[in-house]
Swiss-Prot record:
NCBIfam families: argG (TIGR00032), PRK00509.1 (NF001770). One of its GO terms (cellular component) is cytoplasm. Keywords: Amino-acid biosynthesis, Arginine biosynthesis, ATP-binding, Cytoplasm, Ligase, Nucleotide-binding. This is Argininosuccinate synthase. Belongs to the argininosuccinate synthase family. Type 1 subfamily. Homotetramer. One of its GO terms (biological process) is argininosuccinate metabolic process. L-aspartate binds at T119, N123, D124. PROSITE patterns: ARGININOSUCCIN_SYN_1, ARGININOSUCCIN_SYN_2. L-citrulline binds at Y87, N123, R127, S175, E259, Y271. It catalyses: L-citrulline + L-aspartate + ATP = 2-(N(omega)-L-arginino)succinate + AMP + diphosphate + H(+). One of its GO terms (molecular function) is argininosuccinate synthase activity.
Length: 413
């Protein structure tokens, strides 16, 4: 029996050509694997048939939209994950779920190697291969673009020569990756970081300079996970999809960043993540209401490290799992509702309520009914400032001694 190679298949030009390219270069049979994480476009059946028409001996397709939303997007939301305080890990969190299906397909079809379409200078090669090696330590990984010299020009020529059922064009200058959590755009004229993005860069969001009337939405959370919009119970996938539509119509979630890649270079990236950014804004505010101060302060450090690990392809690492445990524990009381106004590119908190919150009106109010015992403040201040006061007294004592020595020296002169 011939060796089999699992190929992460998107249905596009590069991976369609990679089926025959890999087979010719290695002599192996290729099994195409397509995973739907909410990227839209063609149906899985259309993609499956194209893979077979391009020479795959088998085609494995998986609708992973709910899995992706519940098991990957929701942990990302709980961690308020924004790499470099901006990027909500759009591509970074899709690679682990795709990798899980690639490894499952390798077991099902008896393959010993997994192939992906990443270049040798991006983050995704690391994310795929680290995830695959973690889930299947016995599996090998190859990348046709990186390892088998498959360039875009060669792919077009190969597709035309072999009459593959795929459109070949050089018209679109951008490299685009998208899923239900967001959309990533790079290359083309965007590589000159002085150039501003043009209207054709965007697809998930409308121009925030010309918004419709404000859209007010109430998001309900249970243990840090959104459960309803405007009183309607919905799944995580449905909530993300609806907020993509509503926040996207208001231009929310546009991000333009020069990003520090894992491989050591800086890269200009454009992201659209209307649903993700609206949810993160709401979740952060609900944490402000429900988390104890020291817990919230420490969680920010954990969130940042969690985000860095996931960006760097360490979704399945021991440390990331340990941080998951801490983050999940902090979400026990993150229950309630946040009211957001979506308008002009912004998701602005207008109201918040929680039965498990730590906001106590009677303690916070300055009006009648104030239950805060202000007489306790003086003793608290004395104790709270004692160490700083003691240090200051030492400095003044030493400075005074030095000043006396200076006066004596001047007198002798």
């Amino acid at each position: 029996m011939k060796e089999r190679i699992i190929l992460a298949y998107s249905g596009g030009l590069d991976t369609s050509v990679a089926i025959g390219w890999i087979a010719e270069a290695t002599g192996a049979e290729v099994v195409a694997v397509a995973v739907d994480v909410g990227q839209g476009g063609e149906s899985l059946e259309t993609i499956r048939q194209r893979a077979l028409d391009c020479g795959a001996v088998e085609a494995y397709v998986a609708d992973a939209r709910d899995e992706f939303a519940e098991q990957y997007c929701m942990p990302t939301l709980k961690a308020n994950a924004l790499y470099m305080d901006a990027y909500p890990l759009v591509s970074a969190i899709s690679r682990p779920v795709i990798s899980r299906h690639l490894v499952a397909a390798a077991r099902q079809f008896g393959a010993s190697t997994v192939a992906h379409g990443c270049t040798g200078k991006g983050n995704d090669q690391v994310r795929f291969e680290v995830s695959i090696q973690t889930l299947g330590p016995d599996l090998k990984c190859i990348a046709p673009v990186r390892d088998l010299a498959l360039t875009r020009e060669k792919a077009i020529e190969y597709a035309e020569r072999n009459d593959l059922p795929i459109v070949t064009t050089k018209k679109n200058p951008f490299s685009i990756d998208q899923n239900v959590w967001g959309r990533a755009v790079e290359t083309g004229f965007l590589e000159d970081i002085w150039n501003g993005p043009t209207k054709d860069v965007y697809d998930y969001t409308d121009d925030p300079a010309f918004p419709p009337a404000p859209d007010v939405v109430t998001i309900a959370f249970e243990r840090g996970v959104p459960t309803a919009l405007d009183g309607r119970a919905l799944s995580p996938l449905e909530i993300i999809e609806e907020l993509n539509r509503r926040a996207g119509a208001q231009g929310v979630g546009r991000i333009d960043i020069v990003e520090d890649r894992l491989v050591g270079i800086k890269s200009r990236e454009i992201y659209e993540a209307p649903g993700a950014m609206a949810l993160i804004a709401a979740h952060r505010e609900l944490e402000n209401v429900t988390l104890e101060r020291e817990q919230a302060r420490f969680k920010k450090h954990v969130d940042q490290r969690w985000t860095e690990l996931v960006y760097d392809g360490q979704w399945y690492s021991p440390l990331k799992r340990n941080l998951d445990t801490f983050i999940d524990a902090t979400q026990e009381h993150v229950n309630g509702e946040i009211r957001l106004e979506l308008h002009g590119g912004r998701a602005t908190v207008q109201g918040r309520r929680s039965e498990t919150g730590l906001y106590d009106f009677n303690l916070a109010t300055y009006d009648e009914g104030d239950s805060f015992d202000q007489s306790s403040a003086r003793g608290f201040i004395d104790i709270f400032g004692l160490s700083a006061k003691t240090a200051s007294e030492r400095e003044q004592r030493l400075r005074g001694s030095a000043d006396l020595q200076d006066v004596a020296r001047l007198s002798n002169d």
